[in-house]
């Protein structure tokens, strides 16, 4: 740690990290695969964890939401950070089509309040940093028939 950081501040940082490690220990049993440490912030929501694989030292920051229900899973490499308030949603909440999923390479991150709509396959490479509020969608509405509503024409999933 930086020498300019005082003892009290170091204790606070270590205490908060320890809480995240403890949350990770409790939640890792609900995930398909976890290597190394898993750090989980407060109010993180993980659903369908048996479709989620994490490499070494993955961090889910506060208020992030990760849904694993998809055909190819959510696969996060080593040292991946999912920022505060990020949503990863491969499928509809309400029984729509099952999505494909997400793969993130080592040392990559999604900045705060990002949205990953991975109903089609989304692949993020190694050493990639997505900035705050970045949104990726692997789906598009079909809108070729002008006499029909866009909702009634369906979607196509392409990543």
Predicted regions and their residues:
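Glycine-/small-residue-rich active-site loops that bind phosphorylated ligands and cofactors
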Residues: 46
């Amino acid at each position: 740690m930086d020498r300019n950081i005082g003892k009290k501040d170091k204790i606070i940082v270590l205490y908060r990290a320890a809480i995240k490690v403890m949350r990770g220990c409790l939640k890792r049993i609900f995930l398909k695969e976890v290597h190394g440490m898993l750090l989980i912030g407060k109010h993180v929501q993980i659903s369908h964890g048996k479709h989620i694989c994490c490499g070494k030292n993955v961090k889910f920051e506060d208020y992030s939401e990760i849904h694993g229900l998809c055909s190819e899973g959510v696969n996060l490499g080593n040292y991946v950070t999912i920022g505060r308030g990020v949503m990863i949603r491969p499928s509809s909440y309400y029984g729509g089509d099952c999505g494909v999923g997400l793969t993130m390479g080592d040392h990559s991150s999604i900045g705060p309040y990002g949205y990953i709509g991975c109903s089609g396959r989304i692949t993020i490479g190694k050493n990639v940093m997505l900035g705050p509020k970045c949104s990726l969608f692997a789906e598009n509405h079909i809108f070729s028939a002008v006499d029909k509503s866009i909702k009634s024409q369906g979607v196509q999933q392409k990543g």
